[in-house]
């Protein structure tokens, strides 16, 4: 982060990558966040839930612990949708009142194993009473652009995911699940996949 700052006027964001284990409790993350925040080279931090394992209940304990450790530095949320938690965990984080940004995916780039879809997330935040000062017309235009591109390229859009509790046990990201299943099928060992 020091080198980035020496090279120019870039913002440096520290990632707190979330997982479930006996070691990774709120105190673990708060201690690590405090160390990152103590650096003058780190401008802000975010809770990165790439595995989509952070429940709304966990956000309600984890985010305040981290925020207490980082003081005035901004804290953002980056919650993937793979098992259905992304939108509700992001909303729970915003409801705490100190989250400075909710990371989203625009149009077809949202949902699935990605981040909450931008227009739906904005609507949900507003429905919950949050002020979201963005240009709705511009957001709609951006979404339309990505939808047109996805259709033209034949790319599948992200779709809302149902809750799947098995991910809380095996913690294998969906981006790993698909090729793993294919490889097991190719080896005639597909029956091992649900294990």
Regions found by a protein language model. Name each.
Residues 1-195:
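Catalytic cores and adjacent flexible loops of soluble metabolic enzymes
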């Amino acid at each position: 982060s020091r080198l980035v700052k020496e090279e120019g006027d870039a913002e440096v964001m520290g990632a707190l990558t979330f997982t479930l284990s006996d070691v990774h409790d709120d105190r673990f993350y708060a201690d690590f966040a405090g160390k990152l925040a103590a650096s003058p080279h780190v401008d802000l931090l975010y809770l990165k839930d790439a595995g989509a394992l952070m429940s709304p209940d966990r956000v309600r304990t984890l985010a305040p612990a981290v925020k207490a450790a980082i003081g005035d530095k901004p804290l953002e949320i980056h919650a993937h949708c793979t098992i259905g938690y992304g939108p509700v965990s992001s909303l729970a984080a915003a409801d705490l009142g100190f989250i400075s940004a909710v990371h989203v995916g625009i149009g077809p780039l949202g949902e699935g194993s990605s981040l909450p879809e931008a227009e739906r997330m904005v609507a949900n935040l507003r429905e919950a009473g949050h002020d979201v000062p963005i240009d709705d017309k511009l957001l709609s235009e951006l979404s339309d652009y990505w939808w047109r591109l996805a259709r033209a390229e034949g790319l599948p859009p992200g779709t809302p995911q149902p809750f799947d509790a098995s991910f809380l046990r095996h913690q294998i990201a969906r981006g790993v699940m698909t090729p793993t299943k294919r490889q097991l099928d190719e080896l005639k060992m597909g029956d091992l996949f649900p294990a």
